[in-house]
């Protein structure tokens, strides 16, 4: 295992694989990769807060289900609201909140932290700078365990200095590890990454 910094595009690849798991139907059926979070069996780092946002995103404020609502999906590592379509509302006795029929976020916003981007390498020290990932898939869905490959802009860093590019590497780890107790910091500066939902792929 290596210390690693995941650039926003790399982290988006991981989160987008799991984001349909916020849906009411997926959670009610027990098939969500976020089941452990919403059942209280696991928590993410308290640094992690995610919203389904309306303002500032690229998605329209309406779906075929009606007007979307801003939702706090994860609050400081703990489960928040779920995405509820009209069908799930009727089936499970919930209140619909404008989620699309697939019940995945259309404009997922992850709150930033306190780390300045210019200090990333210094904070990393020695380890991997991972700029992008691809071929992501589940190796163990109930555990939110993901596998995939580094893509480009992956470098070996020593003592806060980039030493060399790294050949393609395979990863296999759980979202509860990436964003769990081992998470040390999040960068402060937001980055808008269009078209990153699971349903949009």
PLM features: what roles do these ranges have?
Residues 1-22, 80, 178, 186-190:
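Internal alpha/beta scaffold segment
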Residues 24-32:
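Mature, solvent-exposed C-terminal subdomains and processed small-chain segments of exported/organellar
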Residues 34-201:
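Dual-mode signal for accessory low-complexity, basic/Gly-rich regions
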């Amino acid at each position: 295992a290596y210390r690693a910094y995941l650039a926003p595009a790399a982290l988006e690849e991981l989160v987008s694989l799991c984001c349909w798991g916020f849906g009411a139907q997926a959670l009610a059926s027990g098939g969500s990769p976020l089941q452990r979070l919403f059942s209280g069996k696991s928590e993410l780092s308290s640094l992690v807060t995610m919203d389904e946002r309306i303002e500032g995103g690229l998605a329209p404020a309406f779906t075929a289900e009606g007007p979307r609502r801003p939702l706090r999906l994860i609050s400081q590592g703990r489960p928040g609201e779920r995405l509820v379509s009209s069908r799930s509302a009727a089936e499970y006795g919930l209140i619909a909140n404008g989620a699309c029929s697939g019940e995945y976020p259309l404009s997922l916003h992850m709150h930033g932290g306190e780390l300045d981007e210019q200090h990333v390498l210094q904070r990393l020290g020695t380890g991997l700078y991972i700029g992008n990932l691809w071929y992501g898939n589940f190796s163990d869905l109930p555990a939110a365990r993901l596998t995939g490959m580094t893509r480009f802009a992956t470098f070996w860093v020593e003592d806060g200095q980039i030493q060399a590019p790294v050949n393609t590497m395979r990863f296999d780890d759980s979202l509860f590890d990436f964003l769990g107790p081992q998470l040390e910091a999040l960068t402060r500066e937001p980055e808008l990454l269009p078209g990153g939902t699971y349903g949009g792929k």
